[in-house]
């Protein structure tokens, strides 16, 4: 992935230290280590703070004593870079807090921030920590019971799996792959779509989940035909990033109209996509003030900027 195709949530400066997850004394060692820091999370949001010399806020990692109780603890790993007061090698534990515990840590709700709003401006370390933490927290929130028998499950491996002691089923964090594509025609125009529930001037590239038994390339061809009514070829992988809402992996591609098919008319499916349209670079630039495009934290925006030849907003 080139620097020109910037994916904020693909960044990471974390050694996940997975070999320690099976250590039965893992958290005893972490709590006795004075370097250990806690990433507090409440309702999918974390604490940020301003740091002198840095234009963007940074994650506010807490001392162990500052977070006495939590609904969930997960060992995220060790940092691999120095940042602020935390040297490389700092162990970080996610602590998911209930409302009362979150209020005790930080009562001002305006100091808790979500990943969608802040992810594009975070450092490599912080983007990796926040993305990883939110994805694993969402997994635990939706997998509290065994999928086979319905009995409650318990957390194992430092927070990285759940086990049902009724039938011994072990469940690992779920990741749902989805393709997202910038389709270009022979004139160099990009294909964008708009959902019926969106504002009329909101546009994005087309995307969809990969189905069972389906390759990524096949998913690209199928989704574009289903949502826009056109056939594509020359499918090329560009990059991927986590999208932990709740636990997707967005896999980005480019594709071109299939020249073997001949003239093709755009036909939105009118279920997910209400309208589709070809945009030239000149049209995007001329209409930019009135267009709502995906936020910079998303791979959708990265695909559009990549096609445009740089940041559309300069």
What is each of the regions a protein language model found here?
Residues 67-121, 210-298, 303-307, 314:
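Unchanged
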Residues 1-122, 313:
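N-terminal alpha-helical interaction blocks
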Residues 56-60, 161-166, 235:
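Short Pro/Gly-enriched beta-strand edge/turn motifs at strand-loop
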Residues 158, 175-176, 204, 247-248, ...:
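Short glycine/proline-enriched turns and hinge-like loops at secondary-structure junctions
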């Amino acid at each position: 992935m080139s620097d020109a195709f910037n994916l904020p949530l693909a960044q990471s400066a974390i050694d996940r230290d997975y070999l320690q997850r099976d250590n039965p004394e893992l958290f005893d060692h972490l709590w006795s280590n004075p370097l250990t820091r806690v990433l507090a999370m409440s309702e999918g949001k974390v604490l940020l703070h301003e740091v002198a010399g840095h234009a963007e806020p940074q994650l506010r990692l807490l001392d162990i004593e500052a977070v006495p109780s939590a609904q969930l603890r997960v060992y995220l790993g060790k940092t691999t870079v120095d940042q602020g007061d935390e040297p490389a090698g700092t162990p970080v534990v996610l602590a998911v807090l209930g409302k009362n515990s979150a209020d005790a840590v930080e009562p001002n709700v305006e100091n808790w921030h979500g990943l969608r709003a802040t992810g594009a401006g975070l450092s490599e370390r912080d983007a990796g920590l926040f993305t990883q933490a939110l994805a694993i927290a969402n997994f635990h929130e939706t997998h509290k019971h065994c999928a086979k028998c319905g009995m409650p499950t318990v957390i194992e491996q430092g927070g990285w799996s759940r086990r049902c002691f009724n039938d011994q089923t072990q469940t690992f964090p779920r990741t749902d792959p989805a393709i997202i594509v910038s389709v270009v025609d022979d004139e160099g125009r990009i294909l964008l779509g708009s959902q019926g529930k969106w504002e009329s001037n909101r546009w994005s590239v087309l995307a969809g989940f990969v189905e069972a038994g389906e390759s990524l390339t096949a998913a690209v061809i199928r989704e574009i035909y289903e949502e826009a009514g056109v056939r594509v070829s020359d499918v090329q992988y560009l990059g991927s990033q986590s999208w932990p809402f709740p636990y997707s992996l967005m896999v980005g591609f480019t594709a071109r109209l299939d020249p073997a098919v001949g003239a093709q008319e755009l036909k939105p499916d009118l279920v997910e996509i209400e309208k589709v349209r070809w945009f030239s670079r000149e049209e995007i630039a001329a209409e930019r003030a009135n267009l709502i495009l995906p936020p910079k934290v998303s791979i959708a925006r990265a695909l559009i900027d990549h096609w445009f030849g740089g940041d559309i907003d300069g």
